[in-house]
């Protein structure tokens, strides 16, 4: 009997689907995308000038080169050129071979637009009769869904493919056509993105608000009252003379205290009412990312990686969705579960229905467990983090179909002369969905029952000084919420956005909060001026709606791209002009009064992708022999000063203001005796101030580090991933990281090759390396192969002649535990020491051994 071929994206997904299909199906994986637009290095006119004649570097020829590099031609009706991704040739050959042997091909890639595009690419590359191909779509990898999907096969939706393709082309145009301009005008290594630049703007705008914020003083009054039955009630003063009470200084609050203390306090109103809090909606991608960040501390990237694993293993529905829709089948199952396990009291008469958000795309289901009966996952294929995420999804889905929480809300209003005092509390009358989401349960103290007109007696009046606070910095969770609120990007892109803007060096995360880097601020200002549409919130959201219309066949993809490119190219040509002609401003160096310690010329303030630093003006000398390359690193105060949460302290800090434009100034350390304050508008504003004194500086500024390899000194440098020390010996090239706490990392081992130990996932072999989590084996072909694992002790014993003195003691550890299980090397991050543990069937046994006083001591749990 001739078989059929089923193609999916991932091996894990293929393995799970294979369990539900019969022997007449061959399930294979494409391992993601198989082809993409042609990609070449961006053309740099200045760099390539010497290789080209004058005619060749004319504008038209520059465009030809750029078009070839982009793989798309906006001037020729959006012609495009795709190429097979490196490493996918073998996969494609296998798929083509099998495709020729089977009677039918089912393209079972993911149900979103990206999955639709992958299905189309597979069909194009495999080729053959179109009638031989069918599109299969399912929301969850369960036997019920798979069988249902294969009974209702369809065809590739080219409208959705065009929507994905239009997005891809637009992003390629923006990235490839703006980046060379940014290199020329601002700094090398910069890039712009249709969505990423808007995300950077959100963070940079918030950064500006925070830095410009001036705390304002205000006071609150807390009045402790005693009822006639001797019970205490604490109330807030909310109004004075029917106006909101908000004293701004101590004199005003002292007047209020005196007045209230002399007044009679009479209960004006005591109100009780019943209120209900509806169950939260099941997760969509953005709310899952936010909840996982807030409740589990997961990054957006980690959340999506784990959700992908859960989906591929068949535990949850598809994880990229912006729809709250739940199928009748899922609702029926969960209602039955609630009734059986919690009783009819917790089950609403009708299912809870949640309307989709205004930005929702196709009617996918919300994220939910595939089987509500599976409360906890018992699988060796998934780690504890994946299991925690599943539990979060399970609880949210179950709670979404339970009854509302019932509250009794109590509000008390008291009059004291012209002052109004108020207090509101609520008591849980019925837990409802809080029975599942225990962490959201509200616990409140109860008021004494008060009669209207009854008198209360003043026990104490307590004034407290407060200061207004700036809006908080964005966390990953709140940034995703802001992107969703503004309609920027899609659920499937949030993870890539938050990762990319960090990788580019435009923002950084510190203590789970986003900070805009100086280059991110400069880039935002330049793009706002030269590409106002591109970086506008409404324009970006509008473009998402237009892409939706392409997917719905309401707008043609070429028309959308033509309309976008016409306006974009006009702005691009204007931005290329000189600043005097209205073009994009340059990232000019700002001269200072500080002399270069080498050539005595002046040092200037310069901003690059690595940060702000001082550079000798002698670097611009046309004579290379006379060019001075001296630079001085500037360390921001935020890098080692803890944030002051006490707003009173903030208000008393001396805020440096620019003498030229009155803008706030960023402060930097040069050394223990010199600070530099730079106008936040730099380089557009040349304002700066030096401050002399004796300052407490970071540990690494006052230390002289010696290279452990060649014994030369090491100097401080700043790279894309932070500060580090590098050996002054150019041949040595040794580096040492600076840890987040300001300490310098210990020297790491040189990689040790183990060609005898072969990898399982590729043809590579292992190399012993040392990282922040101790020693580990990694593939020698990294990053092509990212396979890693812990070393077995028996392997270290076998090759102990290769081990350096630092870890030689590990070869004397027990090779097996008391039960014959092999032991592996582990690392204790708190103690920063290695220890030995054993595993059985992929799980730790509880047996371990530590090295104390030159011997191994066994610990059994």
Swiss-Prot record:
Residues 191-196 are annotated as: Interaction with DNA. The record marks 33, 167-168, 171, 176, 183, 320, 504 as: Interaction with DNA. Its EC number is 5.6.2.1. GO terms for molecular function: DNA binding; DNA topoisomerase type I (single strand cut, ATP-independent) activity; zinc ion binding. Residues 3-141 form the Toprim domain. Keywords: DNA-binding, Isomerase, Magnesium, Metal-binding, Repeat, Topoisomerase, Zinc, Zinc-finger. This is DNA topoisomerase 1. Monomer. Pfam families: Topoisom_bac, Toprim, Zn_ribbon_bTOP1, Zn_Ribbon_Topo. It catalyses: ATP-independent breakage of single-stranded DNA, followed by passage and rejoining. Its cofactor is Mg(2+). Belongs to the type IA topoisomerase family. A zinc finger (C4-type) spans 596-628, 658-685, 707-732. CDD domains: TOP1Ac (cd00186), TOPRIM_TopoIA_TopoI (cd03363). InterPro entries: TOP1_Znf, Topo_IA, Topo_IA_2, Topo_IA_AS, Topo_IA_cen, Topo_IA_cen_sub1, Topo_IA_cen_sub2, Topo_IA_cen_sub3. It comes from the Bacteria. Mg(2+) binds at residues 9, 110. Gene3D superfamilies: 2.20.25.10, 3.40.50.140, Bacterial Topoisomerase I, domain 1 (3.30.65.10), Topoisomerase I, domain 2 (1.10.460.10), Topoisomerase I, domain 3 (2.70.20.10), Topoisomerase I, domain 4 (1.10.290.10).
């Amino acid at each position: 009997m001739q078989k059929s071929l089923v193609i999916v994206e991932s091996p894990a997904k293929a393995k799970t689907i294979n369990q539900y299909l019969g022997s007449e199906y061959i399930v294979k994986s494409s391992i993601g995308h198989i082809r993409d637009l042609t990609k070449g290095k961006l053309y740099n006119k200045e760099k390539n000038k010497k290789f080209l004649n004058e005619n060749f570097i004319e504008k038209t020829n520059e465009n030809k080169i750029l078009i070839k590099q982009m793989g798309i031609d906006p001037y020729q009706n959006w012609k495009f050129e795709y190429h097979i991704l490196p490493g996918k040739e073998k996969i494609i050959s296998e798929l083509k071979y099998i495709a020729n042997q089977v009677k039918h091909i089912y393209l079972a890639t993911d149900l979103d637009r990206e999955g639709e595009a992958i299905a189309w690419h597979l069909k194009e590359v495999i080729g053959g009769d179109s009638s031989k191909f069918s599109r299969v779509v399912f929301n969850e990898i369960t036997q019920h869904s798979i069988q249902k999907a294969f009974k209702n096969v369809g065809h590739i939706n080219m409208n959705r493919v065009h929507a994905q393709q239009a997005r891809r082309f637009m992003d390629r145009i923006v990235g490839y056509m703006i980046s060379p301009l940014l290199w020329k005008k601002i700094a090398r290594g910069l890039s712009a993105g249709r969505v990423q630049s808007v995300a950077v703007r959100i963070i940079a705008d918030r950064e500006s608000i925070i830095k410009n914020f001036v705390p304002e003083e205000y006071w609150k009054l807390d009045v402790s009252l005693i009822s006639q039955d001797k019970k205490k009630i604490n109330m807030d003063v909310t109004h004075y003379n029917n106006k909101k009470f908000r004293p701004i200084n101590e004199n005003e609050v002292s007047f209020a205290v005196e007045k209230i203390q002399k007044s009679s306090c009479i209960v004006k109103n005591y109100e009780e009412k019943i209120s209900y809090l509806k169950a939260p909606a099941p997760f969509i991608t953005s709310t899952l990312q936010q909840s996982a960040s807030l409740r589990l501390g997961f990054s957006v990237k980690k959340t999506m990686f784990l959700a992908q694993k859960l989906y591929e293993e068949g535990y949850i529905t598809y994880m990229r969705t912006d729809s709250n829709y739940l199928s009748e089948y899922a609702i029926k199952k969960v209602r039955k579960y609630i009734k059986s396990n919690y009783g009819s009291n917790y089950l609403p008469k009708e299912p809870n229905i949640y309307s989709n958000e205004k930005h929702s795309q196709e009617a996918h289901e919300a994220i939910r467990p595939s089987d509500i009966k599976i409360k906890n996952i018992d699988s060796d294929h998934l780690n504890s983090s994946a299991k925690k995420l599943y539990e979060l999804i399970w609880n949210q889905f179950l709670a979404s179909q339970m009854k509302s929480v019932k509250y009794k809300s109590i509000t008390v209003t008291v009059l004291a002369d012209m002052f109004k005092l108020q207090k509101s509390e609520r008591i849980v009358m019925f837990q409802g969905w809080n029975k599942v989401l225990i962490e959201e349960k509200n616990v409140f103290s109860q008021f004494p029952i008060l009669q209207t007109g009854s008198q209360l007696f003043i026990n104490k009046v307590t004034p407290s000084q407060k200061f207004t606070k700036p809006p908080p910095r964005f966390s990953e969770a709140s940034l995703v919420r802001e992107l969703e609120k503004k309609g920027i990007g899609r659920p499937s892109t949030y993870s890539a956005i938050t990762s990319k803007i960090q990788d580019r060096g435009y923002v950084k995360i510190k203590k789970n909060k986003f900070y805009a880097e100086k280059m991110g601020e400069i880039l935002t200002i330049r793009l706002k001026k030269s590409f106002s549409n591109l970086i506008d919130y409404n324009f970006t959201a509008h473009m998402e709606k237009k892409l939706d219309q392409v997917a719905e066949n309401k707008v043609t993809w070429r028309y959308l791209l033509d309309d976008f490119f016409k306006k974009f190219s006009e702005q691009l040509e204007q931005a290329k002009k000189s600043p005097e002609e209205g073009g994009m401003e340059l990232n000019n160096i700002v001269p200072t009064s500080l002399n270069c310690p080498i050539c005595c010329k002046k040092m200037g303030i310069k901003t690059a992708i690595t940060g702000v630093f001082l550079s000798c003006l002698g670097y611009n000398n046309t004579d290379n022999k006379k060019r001075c390359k001296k630079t001085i690193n500037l360390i921001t105060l935020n890098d080692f000063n803890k944030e002051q949460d006490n707003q009173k302290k903030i208000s008393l800090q001396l805020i440096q203001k620019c003498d030229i434009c009155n803008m706030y100034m960023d402060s930097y350390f040069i050394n223990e005796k010199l600070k530099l304050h730079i106008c936040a508008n730099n380089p557009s504003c040349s304002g700066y101030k030096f401050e002399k004194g004796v300052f407490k500086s970071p540990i690494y500024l006052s230390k002289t580090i010696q290279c452990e390899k060649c014994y030369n000194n090491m100097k401080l440098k700043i790279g894309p991933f932070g500060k580090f020390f590098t050996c002054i010996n150019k041949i040595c090239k040794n580096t040492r990281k600076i840890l987040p706490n300001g300490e310098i990392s210990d020297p790491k081992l040189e990689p040790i090759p183990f060609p005898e130990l072969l990898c399982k996932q590729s043809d590579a072999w292992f190399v012993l390396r040392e990282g922040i989590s101790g020693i580990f084996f990694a593939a020698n072909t990294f990053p092509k192969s990212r396979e890693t694992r812990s070393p077995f002790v028996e392997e270290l014993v076998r090759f102990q002649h290769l081990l350096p003195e630092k870890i030689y003691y590990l070869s004397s550890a027990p090779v097996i535990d008391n039960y014959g299980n092999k032991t592996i090397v582990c690392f204790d991050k708190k103690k920063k020491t290695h220890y030995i543990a054993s595993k059985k069937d992929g799980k730790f046994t509880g047996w371990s051994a530590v090295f104390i006083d030159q011997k191994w001591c066994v610990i059994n749990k």
